[in-house]
Amino acid sequence: PQEQDPDMLLHVVKETDAGIVVRGAKFETAAAYSNQAFVKPTIGGWAGNEKLSDYAVSFICDMGAPGLKHICRSGFSGRGSVEDYPLANNFDEVDTLLVFDNVLVPWENVLFYRHTSAAAFIRATLHRYSAYPFVTRIRYVADMMIGAALFNARQTGLDKHQAVREKLAMLACYREGINAHLTASIALAEKSPGGL
């Protein structure tokens, strides 16, 4: 995509005494209700590609920075009572497209810049640390969905039908698959090179 429109992906456009100036877009989960975001590089194929070095940037960004625009989808919560919409009101998560229009990032907030090997490393290892809380959260969402499905089936009397029981059992299997991944990540955990 950067060949089609070089300003589409987040990249550095200039360097100043105060910091770096960035332009482009980046998705960040929870940016809509955060004070700051850990902005990471997007591109995956960094290996020795110096043409992409302007895209090899990571920093902490204030969500109210001048030139930063937030484009969010509408939330599902608040469209009705918690009793009528338990999933939407309890498990909604808003992803945000951040559009950086010449945003100044102070040097003290820059984690790395024009460092393709750091960008490759962070893209390769990031999910090692973010997957655990994600899977933990998804397990609770699965519990809520199974509960809602079972409640609905019992209220309508459909829980007596074999086909419905099979679907409920399949939901339970999916939930247990999530739990198995979480359990394995704990049981098979290894220290990272940085000691985490």
Region annotations inferred by a language model:
Residues N179-L196:
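C-terminal helix-coil-helix/basic helical segment that borders enzyme active sites and/or dimer interfaces
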Residues G19, Q36-F38, S58-I60, L97-N102:
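Conserved hydrophobic/aromatic beta-strand scaffold that supports enzyme active sites
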Residues H11, C72-G75, V82-N89:
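Short Gly/Thr-rich strand-loop-strand
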Residues L10-H11, E28, N49-E50, L87-F91:
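Short Gly/Pro-enriched turn/cap motifs at secondary-structure boundaries
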